[in-house]
Regions:
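Catalytic domains of riboflavin
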Residues: 1-461
Length: 461
């Protein structure tokens, strides 16, 4: 089928009949006449042989990916079209969008066991797939790389107190730091995703189809299409210092992988250690860059252990209202009581951006999380030193979190040694005094069962 360049919203391409026809073709079997997806050979070192990811509405017969670009924001694209604000056939002008620095290629790009949740060629759309673009294919970047000036009050305070020393290149006298950053949308190669989670590809497809209420029927009807752009948040990479040093094991690399926590990261809630640990990592990243190395922070959109912010706040209420109040002893079980599971972040996919950057050795890992540590080293990346959050940075109400995590296996380092069962039982959180505010008091709520010692995982690391 020829590529349709018609941009008239009143044309047949945008008629009700054509939309229905498109829907039927998209979900039909691969044997349907006229359906001819561009082949994908995931892991091939030649981007043309590997093939471009095509997941747009303009060329459904050539689509080789399930889902849509922009993750959860694709729904807003639909709203923009429905409101008459966006022409559904609009093709982005990518002329001035190329990355501001070169990344790769690295051998890890060609190993599905190292990269299967992002497209390593996702930032090279105009470079690697110009021939397709010239033919009219609508190929969208899934990675964008730019520069930034980061202005954090913690860094300004660090300059004022002398913890950080401005150098005029990486850190300005104002406390602003200069870095590169890359935004990445998830692109899943389903066979490898299934392998990492210990299930069959068929079971993975069926589970996603079922738990999204049938949102993606092609997961069932198009087993020939192995690429899926899930409707989830992606990640942002921040790099301080020279990015070219990152693959060099002899040059210092400081790294933190951080999972989103809007309440703490943005608004400064003191119920967890997320923002102080993040800003501490940024300080250490700046210092490493000033020593000639590189500092790296990877920020994942995994709000509330990937359970979402509504669920997280329900858990907060459960923690504060349970019999005896908020306690480290029962910290983990509250999430399971509300959500049915303690954590859905599943760090098996987390190391992929590290391999995208060519990381093979991390000298300073700013995290106490065993889950993250194990996920990274299990892919072959060496970690020399694990850095705990300084005790003085732990907020008052976050003592419950840090105490529970260390007791149940969080890497304690030197600062948190000696947390035993007595300390666990003694550690209590702030009383929010809900009684009288909404008619619910502690005595009205059922008690939460005592925390089990099995299957304990951490919230944010």
């Amino acid at each position: 089928m020829p590529l349709d360049k018609d941009s008239n919203p009143n044309s047949y391409m945008y008629s009700h009949q054509h939309i229905i026809y498109t829907a039927l073709c998209v979900v039909h079997s691969p044997q349907t006449f006229g359906i001819d997806p561009v082949p994908i050979s995931w892991g091939h070192p030649d981007p043309l042989v590997r093939g471009p990811i095509i997941c747009t509405v303009r060329h459904f017969n050539q689509r080789n990916a399930i889902g849509a670009h922009s993750g959860s924001y694709c729904i807003y694209t639909g709203l923009a079209v429905a409101a008459g604000k966006l022409n559904p056939s609009y093709v982005p002008n990518l002329k001035l969008t190329s990355p501001v620095l070169n990344i790769g290629p690295y051998p890890s790009w060609y190993d599905p066991k190292k990269i299967a949740s992002i497209d390593p060629f996702g930032h090279l759309t105009t470079e690697a797939y110009s021939a397709y673009l010239d033919k009219g294919f609508d190929i969208r970047p899934t990675i964008a790389v730019t520069k930034a000036h980061i202005d954090l009050p913690e860094c300004r305070e660090a300059v004022r107190t002398g913890r950080l020393k401005p150098d005029g290149k990486i850190l300005m006298p104002s406390g602003q730091s200069v870095c590169h950053k890359a935004a990445i949308e998830p692109v899943w190669y389903l066979p490898e995703i299934a392998r990492r989670f210990g299930c069959t590809e068929t079971h993975l497809r069926q589970s996603i189809f079922r738990m999204t209420n049938g949102m993606y029927p092609e997961l069932i009807t198009r087993p020939d299409i192995k690429i899926f752009l899930p409707p989830i948040g992606g990640m942002t990479i921040y790099i301080w210092g020279d990015p070219d040093t990152i693959p060099d094991e002899d040059i210092e690399l400081t790294c933190r992988v951080h999972d989103e926590c809007n309440g703490s990261d943005v608004f400064g809630s003191d119920i967890c250690t997320c923002r102080p640990y993040l800003t501490h990592a940024i300080e250490e990243a700046i210092k490493t860059a000033q020593r000639g190395g590189a500092g790296l922070v990877i920020y994942y959109r995994k709000e509330g252990r990937s359970l979402g912010e509504v669920t997280k706040y329900l858990v907060y209420n459960t923690r504060k209202r349970q019999e005896g109040g908020d306690s480290a002893e029962n910290y983990f079980n509250c999430t399971e009581q509300v959500a049915g599971v303690q954590d859905t972040r599943f760090q098996a996919l987390m190391p992929d951006p590290l391999h995208f950057l060519g990381v093979t050795k991390i000298h300073n890992f700013i995290s106490m999380s065993d889950m993250k540590y194990n996920a990274i080293v299990n892919t072959g990346i060496k970690i020399v030193k694990r850095v705990e959050i300084p005790k003085e940075l732990v907020p008052e109400d976050a003592q419950v979190e840090i105490t529970a995590k260390v007791f149940h296996g969080y890497n304690a380092g030197k600062a948190y040694q000696g947390i035993d069962e007595e300390e666990l039982k003694k550690c209590k959180g702030r009383d929010y005094k809900y009684e009288g505010g909404d008619g619910i008091s502690d005595k009205d709520e059922g008690s939460v069962p005592k925390q089990s010692d099995s299957n304990v995982v951490e919230e944010h690391a």
